[in-house]
Every structure is written in C-alpha cells, then in structure tokens.
Amino acid sequence: MGRRSTSSTKSGKFMNPTDQARKEARKRELKKNKKQRMMVRAAVLKMKDPKQIIRDMEKLDEMEFNPVQQPQLNEKVLKDKRKKLRETFERILRLYEKENPDIYKELRKLEVEYEQKRAQLSQYFDAVKNAQHVEVESIPLPDMPHAPSNILIQDIPLPGAQPPSILKKTSAYGPPARAVSILPLLGHGVPRLPPGRKPPGPPPGPPPPQVLQMYGRKVGFALDLPPRRRDEDMLYSPELAQRGHDDDMSSTSEDDGYPEDMDQDKHDDSTEDSDTDRSDAESDGDEFGHREDSERDNTEEKKSGLSVRFADMPGKSRKKKKNMKELTPLQAMMLRMAGQEIPEEGREVEEFSEEEDADDSDDSEAEKQSQKQHKDDGHSDSTAAASSQQQAPPQSAPASQIQAPPMPGPPPLGPPPAPPLRPPGPPTGLPPGPPPGAPPFLRPPGMPGIRGPLPRLLPPGPPPGRPPGPPPGPPPGLPPGPPPRGPPPRLPPPAPPGIPPPRPGMMRPPLVPPLGPAPPGLFPPAPLPNPGVLSAPPSLIQRPKADDASAATIEKKATATISAKPQITNPKAEVTRFVPTALRVRRENKGATAVPQRRSEDDSAVPVAKAAPRSGPSVAVSVQTKDDVYEAFMKEMEGLL
C-alpha cells in the first residue's frame, strides 16, 4: 500500500492548506489507535455466539426452501442476510483459529453439519417443485419383471384375444380372426370377450316382433298400428282427450284470444272422438279432414258463411255455451281470422249484409253474422255503432291483431247506425296488396235489397304501370261500415292510371272528402268516389254537430279505414269507375288549395299538398304529383310577388 501525499486528494486534486493539516492529524491519530481498534473488534467477535449464527442461517434456509409456503422475505434479502451471517461466522473462525484451536475445531463441525442440512433441504425442495411441473407421460416406466410360472393364466387373455391397443377403438364389424382365437379357450373358463371390451350392437334391420311386443307397452312403439297407439295415448279417457285437444289448440286459443267456451266445445267434441277412437281406432287427422269437408259442404249449401269447426257438434249446444260467457271484440276478430264461428255475443259486433258477400267465399262468415244480427237482434243504434267500430274482416293482415280497446261513441246522427270515435293512435300497419284472383268483395252501388249501411268500398288495386310501393288501402284492424272519426292513416291515395304515385314525403291525405253526389238508391251517402282519401289529421277529430246528417256522414267517411285486403271483381271496371271522379274533383278545386298553402308557406319551405279550410265545403286535392305541387307553388309565388 503506497503512501499518498497529504497535499492532494485521492483523485490527485490539490487540497487547501487547512485541509492538508487536518488530514495529517487524522493519520497520526489512526496510527496511535490501531491496536486499540483491533482489540475492540476482537472483543465484539468474542461476544457473538457462533451457534446462534448457525441457527439463524438454518432459519433462513427453511424459509427459502419451503415448498408449501412462499418465503416472507425476498430472495435477494435472504441472500444478503445469509452472506452477512456467513462472513461473521468466518471471522469468528479466524479469531479462534489463532487464539483457541479447540474451539475452532468445534465450530468447524457445526459448519459441516449445517451444510449437510442445507443440502437436504434444497434437494427436497427441488424434488417437490419438479414433481409439480413434471408430466406423467415423461416419467419412464420400470421394466416389467418376468411373471412367475405358478400364476394361473385362465383369466388372462392371450395375445390373440387382447385388443391391439388401449388407444384404438376397434369396430364390432371387424375381421373375425380375434373371435376365432378365443374359441379354443371357451372350455377353460376364459370369457368370450376380453375385459373392457363391449359386445357388438344389435344387427341391422327392424327388431323382431317379440321385442316389439315386449317393449310396445313401455315405449309405445308398435310397428303395425302407430296411429292407433297415438290415439290410445291421446284419447284413452275423456280427460286425456280434453287435454290432448286443448294442447293441440293451446297456441291459437291462447295467443289469438280464443274464448274459453271454444275450449269447452272442443272438450265435448273430444269426448265424442275418444269414444269413437277406442272403437274403430281411426286417426284424428282423418276424422278432422272428413269433418272439415262435410262442414264445408254444409256451409256452401247454407250460403251464409264458413263455419270451420274442429269437430262435428250440434249448433244448439254451441249456442248455449256461447251465451255463458261474453266475447270481447278482439276475441271475435281473432275467431274470424282463424275461421271459427262467432258466438252470439260476438254476433252483435257484425255490420255486414248477406247480399254484399254472395260471391265472396273467404269473407262470407262475417256477413252471415251480419245477416243474423239484422234479422234476429233488435239492438239500438248506439249498441250497433259501438260494436261496428270493434269489428274487422277476417282477411285483415297480421298487423291488425293488436287493436285498441273500444271507446264509447256519440249518438247516431241518422237512422243507420253511425260508428263512434276511433281510439286515437297511429294506424296499425299497411295492409297487404290485393292477391291475384282475390274473391269478390264489392257490389254495384245501386243494388236493391241492401239492409243496413253499405260497408265502405275497398280501394282499387294498383293500376297497370304503377311502380311498386305500399299497397293502397287503409291500415288493417278497423271496421268496414260507416267509417268512424279518428286520426288519419298516413297512406297516400291510390293513383289513377297514367299518373305516377306521389312520394310519401310530398303529400298527405286531404283534410275533407269530396262532396260528390251519392250514388242513387243508397242511404247513407255512398262511399267516397276516391277510396284512397282515407282520413284527416287529428285536428279534425271533433266536427261541429250543427252539420246536417249528410255532411256529418261524409265527414265521418273521410276518416274511415277498413281493414280487409282490396278485393275487386273486375279490376278494370272498378278502377275506371272511380278515376274520373277523382280527377274531376282534383282539377276543379286545384285553386282552392292555394289558400291553405299560402297560409302555411311561412311555416314550411317545402311545398306540401294542403287541404281546404275545415269549415268550408271545398273539396281537397286527392292525388297530386310533383308537377301539380310545383304549379301550385308557382301560382302562390306569383300572387305574393
């Protein structure tokens, strides 16, 4: 160790004279105290117990090599602690090596024992940790020792009888060589199949009749009479028959709103069916087919309407059961949609007449009920009016299944029953377009013998050349008959041939219907010449009652909607019947629409087909194209400029 100059630091930097003097004094002091300091260090080492140091190191090892619990201290901290303890123990060894060799030998034995214990702990810890991460497949299996000769090999399958591998699934239809090797061993007690092998499945083909008879009662499988078995399961007793029929009809009777009396009728029908089915073992499907055919023939002979029932049942008991429970209008509508016969309570809802439906085979059921209502029931006009609102033809679209609840209407304004207010709300949806070959629904307006009000004529189908779009006609779910007042359906009226239909955003239905002359021989006035003018906006729900009966009825017809598919007997004749009236009304009153347009011009910058004032008798424009709207707009601008 070389001597450094006192005039510079360790790095060679020059020191101040004061610092140089202090450094020299310190050196002299250290030289004097070196012996004393060495004696102090030796005394401190002698005060320490080497056995306690060994025990501390063992605790650290147990903490480090514990396979169950993670060490509380970090691995680096454990190493530092062990290092310090080890250095201290080594200094003690050096101290006693010089001063007391006997103690030095004892301390060496303690150190060797400690190292052995630490090695065992480390080995155990590594074994446990490796066992947790090792894979079973990687462990080598020991060699199998030779089996002693005194073991009986009766139950041990020979190599020819044992499966080739435990990982392969051999087929039951494999080569029979394995079975042949087993055959000589059958007499010696060897099982036919080796342990773990499953016998092959049943042979292909239908099971023998003995098996069928054995399991026929449990499983219900009979090869010769499956319909009879199904009938016995369903219709073994009247209770089971009722349950079976109710289960068959549960989806329609519950979802479509069938009344409970229909279920009672089905119960009576099913009890009769159960008696007959037990005797002749016919299937329900055949009986229902025969019953529907016979009932269809009966209803065609009656010419009063279809009455599709699910079993033949006398009408008297059916009427008795129907009088037991009231039928809501929604249930009556659903019954008609499903083709069921309407009970007596539901017949009060009908407004159809028989003469209108002489040619209609699909819609004749509702008109049959209307005829019975006019002949048998002498209800007041208000009752008929309230019920007229709640009915819908059976051909209504599925969107009409959700109908608003009935509301009490105003007193009738004339001898024919007038419908009440329609519940406010948006239209229930667009009706489907007229199907090709739809059954006739319309009659000539002047046909004699009409009893009660003529239902509102259906709009004509789409004329030839019209681009595809929403089909004309009112939304489903509203009564045919004199239309009730209410918010309008947002449907454009059907366009005549040659005029493209207006876009939905460019026009609204007019507010007031045209006051054209009614066809002769009708009371109340005939339906609108243009059946597309369906309704008015909600501002015209309340009309002044000072109007005469004719005006009030026509005003109500403006807001009417009917919920049947458009059905036309002669499309060309029916379409051309209404076209000239609609065109004439539009051309005569084109100037009358300028007043509301000019009045609302400041509110909306887009020209829209407005309607005439509410109280005036002027007729609104029924069909307007872009050219008509633009022409009216230019006239307004000329008047303003």
Swiss-Prot record:
Q: Which InterPro entries match?
A: WW_dom-bd_prot_11
Give the span(s) annotated as Required for nuclear export: 633-641
Q: Bias category Basic residues: which stretches? A: 28-37
Gene disruption: observed consequences: Mutant embryos die prior to 8.5 dpc. Heterozygous null mice are small and exhibit defects in axial skeleton, kidneys and esophagus.
Q: Which stretches does UniProt call biased (Pro residues)? A: 192-210, 405-447, 456-504, 510-530
Residue numbers carrying Phosphotyrosine: Y236
Q: Which residues form a coiled coil?
A: 75-133
Q: Which domain of life is it from?
A: Eukaryota
What organism does this protein naturally occur in?
A: Mus musculus (Mouse)
Q: Where do Acidic residues bias regions lie?
A: 253-263, 351-365
Give GO MF terms, alphabetically: protein phosphatase regulator activity
Q: In which tissues is it expressed?
A: Ubiquitously expressed, with highest levels in testis.
What task does this protein carry out? Activates pre-mRNA splicing. May inhibit PP1 phosphatase activity.
Residues where Phosphoserine is found: S181, S237, S279, S283, S353, S361, S364, S600
| UniProt key word Phosphoprotein | yes
Q: Tell me how this protein assembles.
A: Interacts via the PGR motif with PQBP1 in the nucleus. Interacts with the WW domains of WBP4. Interacts with PPP1CA, PPP1CB and PPP1CC.
The answer to whether keyword Coiled coil applies is yes
Name the gene for this chain: Wbp11
Q: Where in the cell is it found?
A: Nucleus; Cytoplasm
List modified residues, type N6-acetyllysine: K13, K565
Which residues fall in a compositionally biased region of kind Low complexity? 381-404
* Covalent link (Glycyl lysine isopeptide (Lys-Gly) (interchain with G-Cter in SUMO2)) residue numbers: K557, K572
What taxonomic ancestry is recorded? Eukaryota, Metazoa, Chordata, Craniata, Vertebrata
**Record protein name field:** WW domain-binding protein 11
